């Protein structure tokens, strides 16, 4: 590892736990990323795409009716307004540009809710790259609008039936494919997890979320928020929001994991609070495991949070106490999904609804003037059929 240019660890978490065949590919990727970060032409092209293709900066919206407490302002960082419908587009454009810079012709990706797959498909269509997306068969069934969008933009969507047929299995299949094709293909990982250098690359390409939020808050309120809140699955939208605030001790960083049917049941996806450290997906990180060390299946109503591990920087922020991690159940997320629609005319992704749920709960308990910012990581179009079925009493 002495030849690496960046630290592969966040405290004890992270690393590059991959088959030897992939080590040269990861080192090549790290070198290309470091060089691109120092290349003014690359940075200018990335910035131009974010502004003139994706639609940045995104709005910072002060909610009018959501807060249950007159002393508490709740702002929404509107990543739902980004082209593609979620924060995923930020880092996908960055990685796709990086892949072209490296001379790759093909992109391999995994997706859960389909948002990363859609973002990858649009970036590949734009930049003339072949696109292959692995998606758990369960997620293909519950996210049909996004599957159609991907195929419409020219992507090949491959349903994965192994294991639990969800995101972790799609990740494994994508990594397996890449191990045999990395000379021509780039694995465009969709979250701030996996082997080094992916957690660092994804954070840096998502950092724009927190940078804009900080600038917008200073313009609007003349000060920084008291807390920033984001949902956490793998953790890319949250680390994008947190990154520029980590060195601002007055700003509390709050991640919200999916409590599913309840933290006291096996049906959740909260490895930070209820997992044990292990090796998974090329990294050392908190992991949902049984008593024999086998990976337990995670569960969440939201496909994008249905992941049994979490990014290593979140694990480190949790271990050091710089960030705190809470959870919201399916029922709480469903209530927040409906509440935001009724109160503000904004339909959030079910993933983002977990963060909304916690923000409303926190606001209710505040006893002084407080400003909260929630990262509204995506829009809820993809979830309306799932929510409709649940509200109509159907099993999902």
Swiss-Prot record:
Keywords per UniProt: Amino-acid biosynthesis, Aromatic amino acid biosynthesis, Lyase, Pyridoxal phosphate, Tryptophan biosynthesis
* Keyword check for Amino-acid biosynthesis: yes
**What pathway does the annotation place this protein in?**
Amino-acid biosynthesis; L-tryptophan biosynthesis; L-tryptophan from chorismate: step 5/5
Q: Which InterPro entries is this protein grouped with?
A: Trp_synth_b_CS, Trp_synth_beta, Trp_synth_beta/beta-like, TrpB-like_PALP, TrpB-like_PALP_sf
Give the catalytic activity: (1S,2R)-1-C-(indol-3-yl)glycerol 3-phosphate + L-serine = D-glyceraldehyde 3-phosphate + L-tryptophan + H2O
EC number annotated for this UniProt entry: 4.2.1.20
Its needed co-factors are: pyridoxal 5'-phosphate
Name of a matching Pfam family: PALP
Residues with the modification N6-(pyridoxal phosphate)lysine, per the entry, are 88
Which Gene Ontology molecular-function terms are recorded?
Answer: tryptophan synthase activity
What enzyme class is recorded for this protein?
Answer: lyase
User: Which Gene Ontology cellular-component terms appear in the entry?
Assistant: cytoplasm
- Do the record's keywords include Lyase? yes
Q: How does it assemble?
A: Tetramer of two alpha and two beta chains.
The function of this protein is: The beta subunit is responsible for the synthesis of L-tryptophan from indole and L-serine.
UniProt lists the family membership as follows:
Belongs to the TrpB family.
Q: What is this protein called?
A: Tryptophan synthase beta chain
**Which species?**
Shewanella putrefaciens (strain CN-32 / ATCC BAA-453)
